[in-house]
Amino acid sequence: MAKRNFNGSQINQSVTIAEQAGAAIDDVRNLILKYDENGDVVVATDGTAPIAGYNDISGAESGKVAKGDQVDVQIKDIGYILAGGAIKKGEEVTATAGKATKAADGDYVIGVALSNAAENDYVRVQISKYQKNAAK
């Protein structure tokens, strides 16, 4: 094996990453995103696919993003996501049409709600991505 020097190699502590949009999105702000088959981010329509993170407010004009534009994606820590329905503090959260909803058995989870929220309110979420166990 070749000799390697890892001096200067660091763990990236950034809360966000920059990804390429796989589709045009009218308003990406505070929506949950997933990767498409090309490795670009798109709105997560439901909880059936692994979640990349959520947009922490980007886009040019009112959150509008064109296919190929750069999108900021928050991948860890705590953030605010638009709610797609009523969510209670402590519930596991997944995506429905890009918005946060209560996760069902087998769904991919973006995290746990740290606040209550009604539909179209912001819900505070501690990001902790995993797949919820299927019902037995």
Task: Please provide the spans of the model-predicted regions.
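Surface-exposed, low-hydrophobicity beta-strand/loop segments enriched in small/polar/acidic residues
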Residues: 1-136
